[in-house]
Every structure is written in C-alpha cells, then in structure tokens.
Swiss-Prot record:
Cofactor: Fe(2+)
Record: residues binding Fe cation 2: 237-238, 270-271
Protein name: Deoxyhypusine hydroxylase
Ribonucleoprotein in keyword set: no
The organism of origin for this protein: Emericella nidulans (strain FGSC A4 / ATCC 38163 / CBS 112.46 / NRRL 194 / M139) (Aspergillus nidulans)
Gene: lia1
C-alpha cells in the first residue's frame, strides 16, 4: 500500500473517531460514525485500519451516554479480534460504570470467545453482590466460551443463519428431527433451564422468522413475544434485540407495549425503541416513537433519537446505517 493510501486510512479513521468522541455532535451522527468504524474493525482478514478502528471505538467509552457506550461494547464484541479484549475487560470490571454497559461488555467477551476471559467472567458470575444483569450475562458468556471450545461443539450441526452477528448463544443444533416452534417455545419460556439453553431456543426461533415471508415467521415471532413477560430483564431485552434484527411487523405490538410501559426497566425499553426504529417503514411506528422524545429516562430518550434517525434511514431505503467521512454525510457502506 502506498503512503498516500495509508494516510487516507489514518484520515478516515481519525475523522470517524472525532465524530464518535465529540460530545457536541448529534447522537445519531455519532452512532453512524460508530457503525462505520465497526465495519472497518470487523473486516476479515484485518487491514491497516483494523486496530485504529478498534482503538477509536474504545475511545468512546469516555462518553457520558450509557446508550452509546453499550453500543461500543457490542461493536467490539463483533470484531473477532483479541485487540478488543483489554478494553472490554476494563469496562466489565468497572463497578462505577452503568450496568447496561458492563452487561454489554460481558456479552461481547462471550462473543469473542477467548478462554483468557473466563477467570474474570466466572468471578463476576459467582459474586452474589453483583447486579443481576451482569451476573446473568457473565453466566451466558462463560457457557458460550466453554461451548465454543468444546468437543461437543465440533460435533454439532447448526442451521445456517441469515444473520452475520455473533450471538450470545448459537441456535439449537440440528438433529434428525428439527425442533418445532412449540418445542422451541417451551424451552424459551422454561425458567428452570440455564439461560444459555433458553437463548439457544431464542435464536433458533429467530432463524425460523427470517426472511419475513417464511411460512414459520409469524408464528415464531409470536412465540418470541411471549418471552417479553419473562422475569429476567436481561432476557426481555434480548428478545427486543432479536425483534430489531428481524424487522417483522408482527413484533410491533409487543415492542410498542414494552416501550410504553413506564414501569419496565430502561435497558428493556431502550432496546424496544431501537427495534421499532428498524421497523420505521411500518405505519404508526414513527408516531409511537415521537411520543417518548421527552421520556423521563435518558437512555430511552437517547434511543428514541437514534431510532427516529434509523426509521428515516429505513424509509429512504439506504443500504447501511453509517457515515462516509469523505462527505461528512450519512451514506451507504457495505455491511460488515
């Protein structure tokens, strides 16, 4: 690569980093910069932009926005790169940090799948004084890493997924008899089972709901919606995240009910808001989101801002929610 190209790479990442870390930039613009950096950080094989992009994402942890910081952690967990580990380990162990951010850092460590994270994750999982959402996430992350490294994993056959995300748990393994939606729903809703196993059912149902015109899609979405009544806030928030991935209109009533419930925890309501943002082309969704622009919870208010920006992006038919540094404007980039 020529010096000019290297300088261009440096300039691209630095421009995005400046937008991401600026507290005076609109939040929606900072999110678009983040997703551009995520694209660069997740490129396989890594390029000369990979490490600077990871460092740029991590620089955002100084932000006051819990919403932004939790999204930073998620993006680092998708990189498949050991360079993300120290930043995530710092966040998950910082008891002064917002629990939503710490949860996302734990989930990201599980997604990266490195055994070197197990000691920290197990200690947090087993700490009775730790907040539930962090303990539960560490429990799932430990199980995911152990599964990733196990001999049993090598023997499992997994159904190919439409989604490129590294999930907190894989879908249920394929067997001679493919699990039915009622079977998966039963596992999903069984609070006596380990969370990791229930998450596997969740992602199995997700994959039966995509694409939206799949014959099983609506029934799978309806099964997932029953999980929004689960006693675990972590579990409820993950269902909302899955709905955001699916963009299935059948999820709108459940998401709207969740966002509208002022007694629901902010972590769940914010995820419902962002999921609705991905359904912005569905009639009535934008009007619903606008009702919560002045919500008492900051994480919900921030999510509404981002969700409305995403809804506009959906209506405009753009390819990827991101920012192109050359123009400084929102534009399309290839999906990571």
């Amino acid at each position: 690569m020529t010096t000019d190209n290297l300088n261009s790479a440096d300039t691209t990442v630095q421009t995005l980093r400046n937008v991401l870390t600026s507290e005076t930039e609109p939040l929606a613009r900072r999110f678009r910069a983040l997703f551009s950096l995520k694209h660069l950080a997740c490129l396989q094989p890594p390029t000369e932009k990979t490490l600077p992009a990871i460092q740029a994402i991590a620089a955002g942890f100084s932000s006051a926005s819990a919403l932004l910081k939790h999204e930073l952690a998620y993006c680092l967990g998708q990189t498949r790169n050991t360079d993300a580990l120290p930043f995530l380990l710092d966040v998950v162990q910082d008891t002064q940090e917002d629990s939503m951010c710490r949860h996302e850092a734990a989930e990201a460590l599980g997604a990266l799948g490195y055994e070197s994270s197990l000691e920290v994750l197990k200690a947090l999982r087993d700490n009775e004084n730790e907040v539930d959402v962090v303990r539960e996430t560490c429990d799932i992350a430990v199980d995911r890493i152990l599964w990733e490294q196990s001999e049993a994993r090598k023997a499992e056959k997994l159904k190919p997924s439409d989604f490129t995300s590294i999930d907190p748990a894989p879908p249920m393994p394929l067997t001679a008899k493919e699990p039915s939606i009622p079977d998966l729903e039963k596992t999903l809703l069984d609070t006596n089972l380990p969370l990791f196993e229930r998450y596997r059912a969740m992602f199995g149902l997700r994959d039966l709901a995509s694409p939206p015109d799949l014959p099983t899609a609506k029934q799978a979405v309806q099964s997932l919606a029953k999980g929004m009544k689960d006693p675990s806030a972590l579990f409820r928030h993950e269902i909302a995240f899955v709905f955001g991935q699916l963009c299935h209109p059948a999820s709108v009533p459940s998401l709207t009910e969740t966002l509208s419930d002022l007694n629901e925890v902010g972590m769940v309501r914010h995820e419902a808001a962002e999921a609705l943002g991905s359904l912005g082309d569905v009639e009535g969704v934008e009007d619903t989101l606008k009702k919560f622009l002045n919500d008492p919870e900051k994480v919900v208010r921030d999510s509404i801002i981002v969700a409305l920006d995403m809804a506009e992006f959906e209506k405009n038919g753009e390819i990827e929610y991101a920012l192109i540094p050359d123009s400084g404007n929102p534009a399309a980039v290839p999906a990571a």
